[in-house]
């Protein structure tokens, strides 16, 4: 587990603007719509990364990270990836998980839903 946590942490350091990573392959996810699970909301810093990774291992095997300029913190989330054609399902999932936005990886844009 420590090796996986360290690997994701290192990946976040070389991707300071954000990333979406399949933690089984350690390869970036470049297509689809990323939606965070509520259970890992407000996870920031390396100390929260273990919890995020544990959740991801039990669910979608994908972790997202992004830097919030308002709080000056790097956040991590366990995320679920939907096909772009499943945008309605992704939005419903996001609402059920109290998310303010989803991220379109294919077009590199945030989609606000609230």
Range-by-range predicted roles:
Residues 1-114:
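Conserved, structured core segments of small domains
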């Amino acid at each position: 587990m420590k090796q996986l946590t360290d690997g994701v942490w290192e990946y976040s350091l070389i991707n300071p603007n954000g990333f979406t990573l399949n933690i089984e392959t350690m390869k970036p996810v470049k297509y689809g719509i990323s939606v965070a699970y509520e259970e890992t909301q407000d996870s920031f810093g390396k100390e929260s990364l273990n919890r995020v990774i544990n959740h991801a291992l039990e669910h979608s095997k994908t972790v997202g990270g992004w830097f919030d300029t308002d709080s000056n913190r790097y956040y991590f989330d366990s995320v679920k990836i939907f096909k772009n054609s499943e945008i309605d399902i992704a939005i419903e999932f996001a609402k059920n998980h109290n998310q303010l936005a989803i991220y379109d990886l294919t077009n590199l844009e945030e989609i606000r839903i609230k």
